[in-house]
Amino acid sequence: MSSKLLTIQLLEELVHAAELNQEGKTADYIPELANVNQELTAIAVQPLGEKTLAYSNNPLHPVTLQSTGKMIPLIGLLEEFGADQLFEWVKVEPSGDDFASITRLEQFGPKPSNPMLNAGAIALCSRIPGVGEQQFRWLEHWVQKLFNQRLSINPLVFASEKRTGNRNRALAYLLKSRNNLGADVHETLDLYFALCSYEAMLDQMLYLPAVLANRGQDPDTGEQILSIETCKITLAIMATCGLYDETGTHMVKTGMPAKSGVSGYTIAVVPGKAGIVVLSPRVNAKGNSIRGEIMLEGLSKAMGWHFALP
C-alpha cells in the first residue's frame, strides 16, 4: 500500500534527501560530460491518468541521453524485425561486467550478452536498415516516435564521443572479426555516437517510460505506439540488465525496471502505474547516478511501487 500521495512536496523531499549525498562525480572520460552542474538533482513522474509532477533543485537544461538512448535501437528493431531475429544478433542475459567490457565479449561472444551493454547497442546499430543517410533517418523516425517529438544531437558531445571512443571502436572491430557486425565499422559507430549524443529536457524523457508503463499506449490519447510484446520484452531487459552490474541492487531496492546513462539520466517504469525520470550527473564507477538511485528508492518506498509488493 502507498504510504503517501504523489505530490510536489514528496518529490521535493526526495530531491533534498538525495542532495545530502556528495558521492560520485560527473563522467569525465567524455570531456563534454564533465561540463555540467554536478549539483543538479531532479525528478519527474507521469502517473497514468494524472498530470505530470516534477521538481528540480536547479534550472534545467538539455542533457544527452547517453546509454538511455540504447532503448531506441532495441525497441525499433523489436518492432520491425521481431524478437526471434533480434535474439540472433544479441543475447538477453545479465553480464555481471561493466558496460564497456571487452573481455566479456571475447569470452562469451560473438553475441553480446545484452542490448544494454555498449557491445550490444553497437551490434544493434549495425542492424539498422538502410545505408548512410537512410540509417540516420531511421534513427530520427524512432526518436520522434519514442519521445513524441524531435530531439537534437549535441554536436560537441558527438565530436567528443568520436574523439575519445577508442574502446567502442575496439568492441566494434571485435564484433566485426566475429562476424556479428551487420555494417561498416565507421558507419555503425557514427550511428552509435549519434544515439548517445541526442539531448533532451527532463520532461521530454518522460514519454517513453510512460508509454512502457501503459502497455505501449500513448498516456494521453490511448494510441497504440508500441506492441504489448515489445513492451514486455523491453521491460524484462530493463529489469535484468538496465543498470549493468548494479541491476540486481537496483531491483532489490526499487523494484522498478530502469535504464541508466552516464549523463545522469535514469528512466524507470512502474507497469500500469507510472513513468519516471530522475537526473543527477554524479555517477558512480559503474556509470549509474547515485542521487538518481536514492530518489528512485525513496519514491518506490513512499508509493509502494516495488514490483514484488502485492
UniProtKB/Swiss-Prot annotation:
Q: Which residues take part in binding substrate? A: 67, 118, 161, 168, 192, 244, 262
Q: Which domain of life is it from?
A: Bacteria
MF terms from GO for this chain are: glutaminase activity
Q: State its Enzyme Commission number(s).
A: 3.5.1.2
Instruction: Enumerate the Gene Ontology biological process terms.
Output: glutamate biosynthetic process; glutamine catabolic process
What InterPro entries has UniProt attached to this entry? Beta-lactam/transpept-like, Glutaminase
Keywords assigned by UniProt, alphabetized = Hydrolase
Q: What class of enzyme is it?
A: hydrolase
Family as reported in the entry's similarity comment: Belongs to the glutaminase family.
Record text on subunit structure and interactions: Homotetramer.
Q: Entry's NCBIfam families? A: Gln_ase
Kindly provide the name given to this protein in its UniProt entry.
Glutaminase
UniProt source species: Legionella pneumophila (strain Corby)
Instruction: Tell me the organism's taxonomic lineage.
Output: Bacteria, Pseudomonadati, Pseudomonadota, Gammaproteobacteria, Legionellales
Q: Which gene encodes it?
A: glsA
